Regions:
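Domain-level signature for soluble enzymes in the chorismate/prephenate branch of the shikimate pathway
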Residues: 1-99
Length: 99
């Protein structure tokens, strides 16, 4: 392997390690977010309260604005947030207990 290729491989491994570290941080944040969602779910009396379309729209608009302000592709963040919201809606539906 030539020197240039070796340096690229080393740099690639370093960047992948940084991504792995960020993934670990994201997992901690997701754990914290899930704990809050559990608390929110306990406050909901009816299953229809799980999906709040107005709030979802507000969240997605806020994330879009912040993404643009921070020079992040809003298509990426929109996709991430929509999937996260869908996942938590599914989680709430599976864990909803009638009172």
């Amino acid at each position: 392997m030539n020197k240039c290729r070796l340096l690229k491989k080393k740099k690639l491994n370093k960047l992948r390690n940084e991504l792995d570290s960020l993934d670990n941080t994201l997992l901690k944040i997701i754990k914290k977010r899930t704990a809050i969602v559990k608390q929110v779910l306990k406050l909901k009396d009816y299953k229809y309260q799980i999906v709040d379309k107005k709030r979802i729209k507000i969240i997605l608009n806020r994330i879009k604005k912040k993404s643009i302000k921070n020079k992040i592709d809003p298509k990426i963040t929109n996709h991430i947030w929509k999937n996260m919201i869908k996942s938590y809606i599914d989680y709430e539906r599976r864990n909803f207990k009638k009172k």
